[in-house]
Amino acid sequence: MIFAKGHGTQNDFVLLPDVDAELVLTAARVAALCDRRKGLGADGVLRVTTAGAAQAVGVLDSLPEGVRVTDWYMDYRNADGSAAQMCGNGVRVFAHYLRASGLEVRDEFVVGSLAGPRPVTCHHVEAAYADVSVDMGKANRLGAGEAVVGGRRFHGLAVDVGNPHLACVDSQLTVDGLAALDVGAPVSFDGAQFPDGVNVEVLTAPVDGAVWMRVHERGVGETRSCGTGTVAAAVAALAAVGSPTGTLTVHVPGGEVVVTVTDATSFLRGPSVLVARGDLADDWWNAMG
């Protein structure tokens, strides 16, 4: 069984090319694959298929709004095996893989997801490296919220980027203070406000067009980066200074991306790296349940 390993600003994924959606992706198999000791290790799994194939085998009960049968479909699973609506870093790596592997020849095309269609532009593509931007759709502000991260209470802005986020801008937080925060510890939040859980970002206030961010992803824990989280962070940071639109560079532990927020949509641009390709042992895969 063929796989590839890639990352977007060190948010890493195992890609499983499965155009006809024939693989059975149980939660146990995904979790084992993402385990950094038992498996290959990753923050999530990206099945590379089409929307029509995913619907035909029951991965999708129906096509997400705006997604066409012929669109590529990113079947994204968190490290715990749960399905996820969207992953901004994952879309960039997914698009890079399609182009680098020859499955796609266009520089501009649509990647479908549970959150809907995501148009991508591949600005530069090599076998290992790419520069990709994604139209992430409109990021919707959902009001104020609170979370406890690393033993500290933060006030934030709830933002829907196809998945739920609570982006907490702290004007007193320094880059060093952010680095010292225990973001990997369990976070707490209002379960009534976020019944399905939430991704929590903690970030500095914008300075010279840039913010620094760390993220605790639901179903994963702290990751080196989160694409949708950087969009939520940019929305919250711009709102904190009274600007509903604008462009910010978002620094994360794994690198940096550029987020542009407009009245109608948002764009995420950043790198993708394809690290390896190989074969999974069928006996191991089958034994994982």
UniProtKB/Swiss-Prot annotation:
- Specify the effect of C87A: Completely abolishes the diaminopimelate epimerase activity
Subcellular locations according to the entry = Cytoplasm
Pathway assigned to this chain's UniProt record: Amino-acid biosynthesis; L-lysine biosynthesis via DAP pathway; DL-2,6-diaminopimelate from LL-2,6-diaminopimelate: step 1/1
Regarding temperature, what does the record state about activity? DapF is almost 50% more active at 30 degrees Celsius than at 25 degrees Celsius. At 37 degrees Celsius the activity is slightly less than at 30 degrees Celsius.
Q: Does the keyword Amino-acid biosynthesis apply?
A: yes
Q: What happens after mutating C87S?
A: Strongly reduces the diaminopimelate epimerase activity
Question: Which GO biological process annotations does it have?
Answer: lysine biosynthetic process via diaminopimelate
Q: Which reaction does it catalyse?
A: (2S,6S)-2,6-diaminopimelate = meso-2,6-diaminopimelate
Q: Residues in the active site?
A: C87 (proton donor), C226 (proton acceptor)
Residues under site feature: Could be important to modulate the pK values of the two catalytic cysteine residues: H165, E217
**What is the enzyme's main class?**
isomerase
* One GO cellular component term: cytosol
The record's pH note reads: Optimum pH is 7.5.
- Into which family does the record put it? Belongs to the diaminopimelate epimerase family.
The miscellaneous annotation reads:
Was identified as a high-confidence drug target.
Q: What is this protein called?
A: Diaminopimelate epimerase
